């Protein structure tokens, strides 16, 4: 089976990856970036095949946007690899060191996780991001992208692997599962002992399937039912601009806003301004009963809308009595990704920051900033919505673990 053969190769490569020096890794990353630019034509040609097939199957426009590559996006992938090369290498760093009364020196050293499996859907840029981050953090990576992007992923991964191996990276460190049969994914999720960690990136159904069926440890990522609460002291122009950015800039990504909650005391003034702006930009508004009374042109929301990650130009809107009801709503429906409050009230801002149990919580800013690059981590492997090991944008450090190193001078336990 393809995945088992490649997992064994990755396991062998991981031992050598763990001891690679930083200069070799940085040289490889920059060579990989050069190769993406040099072979951009091959990448775009392969991507065109994927896009044509997606259009034939009437895939949603927002999902085709995630799939589509152009010169600018390939250049951004290359830039991301260069940025990763410029980041400090976490591997081998000692976080703490202390001395025991018997003279033993004990420290916590950052080390690679080993072999990381990435299961993702239709965003071919993930192929480059994942390969780069895993390489810099000393891990071998097995990539399994969605069938929608198979031609793009084969082109990108083969270009990256060739460039990496030319600069001293062990063969088997960057591999793509080319078989699009779902059984390969099921086998991949059972390869304990060969794969150390699986990170799924994609929609709710993909992540749910991996969590429920993988015997390999999983970090849950990505599903983003994100909220913005417009408090009664919010400045309307700021609130409107933030909501438009969070919904319209890239509606098909996990940090786009899906539900806006509006304080009842400003609803009659603010909602018409917001609805007019959003509808002019092609957004479909689904509102609660009060929203519909104020703006009759909107569609009526159902309970299903409050729990839906649309990944499209659709926005649910609800009028709430105040911050307590907003917090209750977010607690009930949030996926723990990103939430924002628009307010000039310091106490409410602090209450929101402390009360909302999500990976990223904002005051007066768009949820679209939940991103490794925007946080200064360089590219990210995903946004973790769980609490164990990693939370929020997962950069280099989150792709490592630690071990204790103990330095002695002949001590024995008595």
From Swiss-Prot:
Major localization listed first in the record, in broad terms: cytoplasm
NCBIfam families on file: PRK00197.1 (NF001221), proA (TIGR00407)
Protein location: Cytoplasm
Pathway in which the depicted protein is active: Amino-acid biosynthesis; L-proline biosynthesis; L-glutamate 5-semialdehyde from L-glutamate: step 2/2
Species whose genome carries this gene: Thermoanaerobacter sp. (strain X514)
Transmembrane domains' residue ranges: none
EC number(s) on file: 1.2.1.41
GO MF: glutamate-5-semialdehyde dehydrogenase activity; NADP binding
Keyword Transport carried by entry: no
GO CC annotations on file: cytoplasm
InterPro entries (alphabetical): Ald_DH/histidinol_DH, Ald_DH_C, Ald_DH_N, Aldehyde_DH_dom, G-glutamylP_reductase_CS, Glu-5-SA_DH, GPR_dom
Substrates-to-products reaction catalysed: L-glutamate 5-semialdehyde + phosphate + NADP(+) = L-glutamyl 5-phosphate + NADPH + H(+)
Protein name as catalogued: Gamma-glutamyl phosphate reductase
Keyword Repeat appears in the UniProt entry: no
GO BP term, example: L-proline biosynthetic process
Pfam families: Aldedh (PF00171)
Class of the enzyme per the UniProt entry, highest EC level: oxidoreductase
Family: Belongs to the gamma-glutamyl phosphate reductase family.
């Amino acid at each position: 089976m393809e995945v088992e053969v490649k997992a064994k190769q990755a396991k062998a490569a991981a031992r050598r990856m763990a001891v690679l020096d930083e200069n070799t890794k940085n040289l490889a990353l920059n060579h990989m970036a050069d190769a993406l630019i040099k072979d951009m034509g091959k990448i775009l040609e392969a991507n065109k095949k994927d896009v044509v097939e997606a259009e034939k199957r009437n895939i949603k426009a927002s999902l085709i946007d995630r799939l589509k590559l152009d010169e600018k996006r390939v250049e951004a992938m290359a830039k991301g690899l260069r940025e990763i090369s410029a980041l400090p290498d976490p591997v081998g760093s000692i976080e703490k060191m202390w001395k025991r009364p018997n003279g033993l020196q004990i420290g916590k050293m950052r080390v690679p996780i080993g072999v990381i499996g990435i299961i993702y859907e239709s965003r071919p840029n993930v192929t480059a991001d994942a390969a780069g981050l895993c390489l810099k953090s000393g891990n071998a990576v097995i990539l399994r992208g969605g069938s929608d992007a198979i031609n793009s992923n084969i082109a990108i991964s083969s270009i990256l692997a060739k460039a990496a191996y030319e600069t001293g990276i062990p063969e088997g460190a960057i591999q793509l599962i080319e078989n699009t049969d779902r059984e390969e994914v099921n086998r991949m999720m059972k390869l304990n002992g060969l794969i150390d960690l699986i990170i799924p990136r994609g929609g709710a159904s993909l992540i749910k399937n991996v969590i429920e069926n993988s015997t390999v440890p999983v970090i849950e990522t990505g599903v983003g039912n994100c909220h913005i609460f417009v408090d009664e002291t919010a400045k309307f122009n700021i609130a409107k601009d933030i909501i438009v950015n969070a919904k319209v800039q890239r509606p098909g990504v996990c940090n786009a806003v899906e539900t806006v909650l509006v304080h009842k005391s400003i609803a009659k003034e603010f909602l018409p301004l917001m609805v007019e702006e959003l509808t002019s930009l092609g957004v479909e508004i689904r509102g609660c009963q009060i929203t519909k009374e104020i703006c009759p042109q909107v569609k009526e929301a159902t309970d299903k809308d409050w729990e839906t990650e649309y990944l499209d130009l659709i926005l649910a809107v609800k009028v709430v009595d105040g911050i307590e009801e907003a917090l209750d709503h977010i607690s009930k429906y949030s996926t723990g990704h990103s939430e924002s409050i628009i307010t000039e009230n310091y106490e409410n801002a602090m209450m929101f920051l402390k009360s909302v149990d999500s990976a990223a919580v904002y005051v007066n800013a768009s949820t679209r900033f939940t991103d490794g690059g925007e946080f200064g981590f360089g590219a990210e492997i995903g946004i973790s919505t769980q609490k164990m090991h990693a939370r929020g944008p997962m950069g280099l450090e989150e792709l490592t673990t630690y071990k204790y190193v103990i330095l002695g001078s002949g001590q024995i336990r008595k």
